[in-house]
Amino acid sequence: MIDAPFIEIEDLHFSRGDHEIFRGINMTIPRGKVTAIMGPSGTGKTTLLKLIGGQLTPERGRIVIDGQDVHRLSRKALFTLRKRMGMLFQSGALFSDLDVFENVAFPLRVHTDLPDTMVRDLVLLKLQAVGLRGAR
């Protein structure tokens, strides 16, 4: 049995004024995989992520995440769905008033009930894994 994709984009159309950004885009993103949206500046990467996250509304087409049509969800249901997603945009990804350790710890503190000692251990483990051991 083949698993259903986590994200399905069907016949997506989106423009800003007279500038057509997407025309009939179809795409599937598998469950449990890290997926990168890459391309030169101005090709619509951030716009696509905002459409997927429900921050923008397409002119036509559907974006379905885990069986839910993003643009037909209530505000509350959309916020619930967003809690299960992670998006990293090309800028503004770090809190400039927090050090490296606290930037890594932040989502663990906000989205889990882990004790501080476990958050500390996980952050140190992750920093070491990417060669930032001792970073503050």
Residue ranges with predicted function:
Residues 53:
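Helix-to-loop junction immediately C-terminal to a conserved catalytic motif
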Residues 61-69:
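Conserved ABC transporter NBD signature motif
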Residues 97-106:
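Short coil-to-helix segment of the ABC ATPase nucleotide-binding domain corresponding to the Q-loop/switch region
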Residues 68-69, 112, 116-135:
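Conserved ABC ATPase "signature" region
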Residues 84-85, 89-93, 98:
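ABC ATPase nucleotide-binding domain signature
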Residues 38-40:
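The feature captures the beta-strand-to-loop junction immediately N-terminal to the Walker
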Residues 70-86, 110, 116:
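ABC ATPase NBD coupling module
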